[in-house]
């Protein structure tokens, strides 16, 4: 097993909550993580038809006849089980009684909100971070990581990426989207998924998507929500603050995994990647998605934004996670050299927001990080390897 940064945080959460749920995209390593983190717990996988039937027919006996130290995988397959978990956890009032995970996050989280609110700690396990992937492949470059992505099976079993991602997309569309989310036009949804990849790093304009697909605004809005709830994509909202300026109000679109993004863009080699017209947007996606992982792995909620105003002043990432009053401003560039002009917008916005010099960063593919007058020039590799202190 590739060591996961979230392992210790899952174990800590089990000391705080009677129930811990690990969510995340398909095949991000949830089952492996919880079994590794809690080796003494009984493991039940409701993919097993017999166990699933028991849990649905008689949830009381399913729980009462077993130890209270249980891992229940694919728990969403037994919705009536959640009320029983609530009863037992309220009776015993002991932390760490049940560990839940599942691949249909929208169903799992719905049940948790309905029956286990306040009783369950919910953690998000995304695909491997660059730091975690290096544990399996120490010579992995950031370009190779962008192309491969972070799904563990690609790094420990060395499955060919084209085979893995084709299977992944098919499973996602045929099982999650078709079976559980009542999407009827799967061919159009597949086209929609590729269209999202082609608009990575751009503003989410549902009307434009609807026109390109020949469908309705409401359908596109619903499908965007599906992609986010299943951890395929996420939106980066614009920064507002208390500025007396006209600011963009539309969020930007990014993918949680650049390997899947590259697959959808039909990028098959590092050379293809570096020559692709969206290379800059993919690097931008990498830095932002890795920042999201870093915070989730430390049990922190990312407060990330971008800035754009009507004067065409824009900064790729405004990180308010540590401070609302002094956010970190990060401009992301795909080149291998730093030029002072890269920092022009950083300086403009720093003045508006009263951001100190230490919080201005240009991230690019330079070999080493350094300071240039009032700007931090960070190697993207160094930025990706940055650590985050977990919640105390």
Segments predicted by a language model, with ranges:
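Hydrophobic anchor at the beta1->P-loop junction of P-loop NTPases
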Residues: 22
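Conserved catalytic/switch belt of AAA+ P-loop NTPases
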Residues: 82-100, 114
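Domain-level recognition of nuclease-like catalytic cores that cleave nucleotide substrates
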Residues: 127, 137, 365-392
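Accessory nucleic acid-recognition modules appended to NTPase machines
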Residues: 159, 163-327
């Amino acid at each position: 097993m590739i060591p996961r940064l979230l392992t210790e945080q899952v174990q800590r959460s089990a000391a705080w909550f009677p129930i811990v749920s690990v969510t995340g995209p398909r095949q991000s390593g949830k089952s492996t993580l919880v079994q590794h983190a809690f080796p003494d717990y009984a493991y039940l996988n409701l993919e097993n038809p017999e166990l699933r039937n028991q849990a649905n027919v008689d949830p009381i006996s399913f729980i009462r006849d077993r130890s209270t130290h249980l891992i229940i995988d694919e728990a969403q397959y037994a919705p009536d089980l959640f009320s029983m978990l609530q009863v037992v956890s309220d009776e015993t009032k002991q932390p760490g009684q049940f560990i839940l995970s599942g691949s249909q996050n929208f169903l799992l989280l719905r049940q948790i909100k309905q029956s286990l609110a306040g009783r369950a700690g919910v953690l998000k396990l995304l695909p491997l971070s660059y730091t975690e992937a290096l544990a399996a492949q120490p010579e992995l470059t950031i370009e190779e990581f962008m192309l491969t992505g972070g799904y563990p099976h690609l790094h420990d079993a060395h499955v060919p990426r084209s085979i893995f991602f084709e299977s992944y997309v098919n499973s996602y569309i045929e099982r999650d989207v078709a079976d559980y989310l009542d999407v009827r036009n799967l061919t159009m949804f597949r086209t929609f998924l590729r269209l999202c990849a082609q608009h990575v790093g751009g503003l989410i304009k549902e009307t434009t998507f609807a026109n390109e697909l020949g469908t309705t605004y409401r359908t596109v809005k619903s499908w965007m929500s599906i992609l986010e709830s299943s951890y395929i994509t996420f939106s980066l909202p614009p920064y507002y603050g208390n500025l007396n300026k006209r600011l963009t109000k539309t969020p930007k679109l990014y993918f949680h995994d650049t390997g899947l993004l590259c697959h959808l863009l039909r990028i098959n080699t590092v050379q293809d990647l570096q020559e692709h017209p969206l290379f800059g947007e993919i690097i931008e996606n990498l830095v932002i998605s890795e920042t999201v992982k870093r915070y989730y792995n430390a049990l922190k909620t990312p407060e990330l934004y971008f800035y754009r105003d009507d004067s065409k002043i824009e900064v790729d990432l405004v990180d308010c996670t540590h401070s609302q009053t002094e956010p970190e401003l990060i401009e992301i560039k795909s080149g291998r050299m730093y030029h002072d002009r890269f920092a022009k917008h950083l300086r403009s916005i720093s003045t508006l927001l009263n951001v100190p010099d230490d919080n201005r960063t240009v991230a690019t593919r330079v070999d080493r990080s350094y300071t240039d007058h009032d700007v931090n020039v960070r190697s993207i590799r160094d930025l990706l390897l940055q650590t985050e202190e977990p919640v105390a």
